[in-house]
């Protein structure tokens, strides 16, 4: 359940909204990277302090994808440089961060730098950053002092029923846990014998690929990211030229290949990049292409990693 008290924090005066709540005043929908942005962060900190919150959990973390809708250009590192290592270890679903780190994540989201996540503390406190510099804060406390402080900062904290980004409004698409039964299914497929391709989505828009065998399955399992979404595909095709020749002319696909050194890489391409792709994958051992269209993207099976207690808490 979402927290019982929710506020929409904005720089937009409610007096400029019509009877349906639509805003008709001057609207600057990007961060000023300055005093207004700082006011947002101070307001959120005030709500957290009044709610007794000193740590928040990262939920459904994402990075820049193939298509971006942000109003500002994404930056290298997705706005996470200095907060997490280059490999983004520590930025995963369920990771706990201090309020100061959470505020830096909010800053990156306000700036459309690429990263996005929900910030939550169970049903006690939530922070969600939406479009056009709208921030939604939920708390189990009414936070009257924080509301007043927000107004002092030149912003507006409007009471609302619920954040439009509340997780309760969305049904998870994946409800199967990657438990021992799942891994036995994988092991049975490998025993045919054959190899399989494992897609590990460790963040939204971030994947790693593993070529599975009976012998390396346990090794791969040991390095998978917390709460990752796992999709099992048929093995790569050793006839790379045939895979390249079969690329669709009017569709964007994920192209996955194994380099001569055994490294598995992938890139999202459309027809304008086919010639360049052929050069990039010269010498590849094997490859495949996977459609991005959901109605054409059918792995053999997929599931999400549960926590160490066996409970599936990931939301995919």
Where in this protein do the model-derived segments appear?
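Structured alpha/beta or helical-core interaction and ligand-binding surfaces enriched in interleaved
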Residues: 1-134, 138-316
């Amino acid at each position: 359940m979402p927290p019982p008290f929710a506020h929409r924090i904005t720089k937009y005066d409610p007096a400029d909204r019509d009877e349906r709540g639509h805003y008709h005043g001057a609207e600057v929908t990007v961060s000023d990277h300055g005093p207004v942005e700082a006011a947002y962060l101070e307001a959120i900190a005030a709500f957290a302090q009044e709610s007794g919150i000193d740590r928040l959990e990262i939920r459904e973390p994402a990075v820049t994808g193939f298509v971006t809708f942000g109003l500002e250009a994404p930056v290298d590192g997705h706005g996470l440089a200095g907060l997490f290592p280059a490999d983004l270890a520590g930025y995963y679903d369920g990771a706990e961060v201090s309020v100061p780190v959470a505020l830096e994540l909010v800053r990156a989201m306000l700036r459309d730098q690429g990263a996005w996540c929900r910030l939550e503390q169970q049903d006690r406190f939530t922070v969600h950053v939406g479009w056009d510099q709208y921030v939604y804060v939920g708390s189990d406390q009414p936070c009257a002092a924080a509301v007043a402080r927000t107004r002092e900062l030149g912003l507006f904290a409007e009471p609302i029923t619920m954040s439009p980004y509340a997780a309760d409004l969305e049904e998870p698409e994946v409800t199967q846990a990657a438990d021992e039964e799942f891994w036995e299914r994988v092991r049975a497929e490998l025993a045919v014998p054959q190899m399989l391709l494992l897609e590990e989505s460790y963040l939204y828009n971030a994947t790693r690929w593993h070529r599975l065998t009976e012998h390396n399955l346990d090794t791969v399992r040991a390095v998978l990211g917390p709460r990752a979404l796992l999709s099992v595909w048929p093995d790569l095709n050793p006839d790379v030229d045939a895979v390249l020749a079969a690329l669709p002319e009017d569709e964007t696909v994920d192209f996955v290949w194994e380099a001569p050194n055994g490294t598995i890489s992938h890139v999202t391409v459309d027809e304008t990049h086919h010639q360049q792709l052929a050069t990039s994958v010269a010498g590849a051992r094997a490859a495949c292409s996977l459609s991005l269209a959901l109605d054409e993207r059918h792995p053999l099976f997929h599931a999400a990693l549960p926590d160490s207690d066996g409970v599936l808490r990931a939301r995919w």
